């Protein structure tokens, strides 16, 4: 990239939990989708991990915002500021001016026209000149290394923070899809509610997330893969005295059961709407899991036992969508499924 390069190409996975930006085939930004704003002027104070550190710790003059909810933009102004702040990280200190941007952005396959317009407008306000949108399951498939233009059926289950995207892909298009607003954030909320109800301990969203990462599971028997118990510190809900509660993966598996069952049912529903020829391909190729939710212990095994089709976890599930958007960026003229 030259000093006087006027156009910069970036691919973005604009997620509810994290935003990932790829430029020149490299992941240059991988930050939480959080922005901290001055409550009086609405000016941005911090973005990404710096803003996440302030989350749930602010005073009256600062508000921290997660601009996306359920995979779509919930706060347009905050999203625009967040995108601008994260894009600045891409060309930090390397130029005298900001270049105009050619962008490919991943969006949920269940997005309405209004939601797609909101993403495009945010990108254009953040200096995007050529903005292309790609449905997240399609981007994930490309990122995993699947030939999406082949006359063959492949199924992707992309479990993000705000939505789960399930799609059957063949010949460069989405044949059937199911987008549900049940995903990683719901698992975190389940843990928060469970800790309060079962152990009388108040835990923040961030603490619930740490519990999910440490002992989250979709199965009550993980065998040799079982994690150690996690010690939770927090105030007693009734007395406000400090508590120390050990939590094991089996109880978390029980507390996540209903949300995981919703994801199972969504996969079954997408399979019901799949043409028989493509269904046969999926049984042969297996189903691919991508997104942060794919990292939930035992999820692949649980889905396999329920659905009787092999499940594979993507090599790098957190970055599959961003990597796929990056490959699409290089093939803008060839990939007809990109939306302008």
Across the structure, where does each feature detected by a protein language model lie?
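Nucleotide/phosphate-binding catalytic cleft detector across ATP-hydrolyzing
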Residues: 1-159, 167-287, 294-340
């Amino acid at each position: 990239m030259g000093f006087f390069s006027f156009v910069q190409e970036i691919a973005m996975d604009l997620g509810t939990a994290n935003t990932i930006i790829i430029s020149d085939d490299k992941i240059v930004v991988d930050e939480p989708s959080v922005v901290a704003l001055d409550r009086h002027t609405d000016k941005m104070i911090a973005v990404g991990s710096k803003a996440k550190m302030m989350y749930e710790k602010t005073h009256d003059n600062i508000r921290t915002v997660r601009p996306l909810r359920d995979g779509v933009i919930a706060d347009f102004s905050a999203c625009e500021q967040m995108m601008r702040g994260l894009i600045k990280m891409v060309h930090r200190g390397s130029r005298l001016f900001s270049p105009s941007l050619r962008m490919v952005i991943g969006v949920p396959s269940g997005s309405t026209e209004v939601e797609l317009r909101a993403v495009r407008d945010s990108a254009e306000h953040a200096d995007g000149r050529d903005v292309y949108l790609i449905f997240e399951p399609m981007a994930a498939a490309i990122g995993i290394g699947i030939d999406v233009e082949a006359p063959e059926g492949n199924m992707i289950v992309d479990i993000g923070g705000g939505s789960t995207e399930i799609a059957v892909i063949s010949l460069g298009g989405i044949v059937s899809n199911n987008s549900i607003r049940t995903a990683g954030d719901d698992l975190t909320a389940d843990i928060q509610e469970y800790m309060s109800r079962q152990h009388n301990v108040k835990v923040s969203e961030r603490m619930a997330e740490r519990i999910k990462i440490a002992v989250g599971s979709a199965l009550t028997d993980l065998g040799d893969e079982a994690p150690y118990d996690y010690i939770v510190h927090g105030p007693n809900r009734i007395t406000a005295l400090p508590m120390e509660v050990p939590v094991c993966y089996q109880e978390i598996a029980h507390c996540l059961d209903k949300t995981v069952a919703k994801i199972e049912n969504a996969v079954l529903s997408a399979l019901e709407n799949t043409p028989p020829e493509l269904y046969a391909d999926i049984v042969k190729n297996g189903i691919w899991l991508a997104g942060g939710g794919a990292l939930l212990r035992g999820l692949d095994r649980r889905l396999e036992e329920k659905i009787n089709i092999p499940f594979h976890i993507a090599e790098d599930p957190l970055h599959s969508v961003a990597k796929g958007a990056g490959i699409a960026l290089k093939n803008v003229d060839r990939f007809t499924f990109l939306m302008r």
